[in-house]
Amino acid sequence: MLAPIARGTWSSISNLAIEAFVNCCDSREQMDIEVEQNKLLLQERTSYFISLLDEYKIPYYSFQNGFFVTLKFANPNPVVEFLMQDHIYTINCNHGVRVAVCSLNKKELLKIANKVKEFIQITCI
């Protein structure tokens, strides 16, 4: 029973942030425009990151949409630890490393792709 409680507590949206977002807009139309701009920005970042992963031949799970891209690794612990040495913080999940594309700019996404590529080359995975 802990999982639903934890998910509702820690994985839910920030009500204060949503209230601030809603209150900063003068109209519903303005808010809709901002939401659309943010969707496009997220799609642009994700497309860029996935193009780097494809170019570097870094495996990742199928991506449709969302805030995260998950890289495929049977044992993600060494990858996460390697990235942390450069202050790159990802999420360790079952057979993968989750990258929060939503919070990163292109320069940071390039850095992550290069570090993962370096990890693969060093470890000969």
Segments predicted by a language model, with ranges:
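PLP-dependent class I/II
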Residues: 1-125
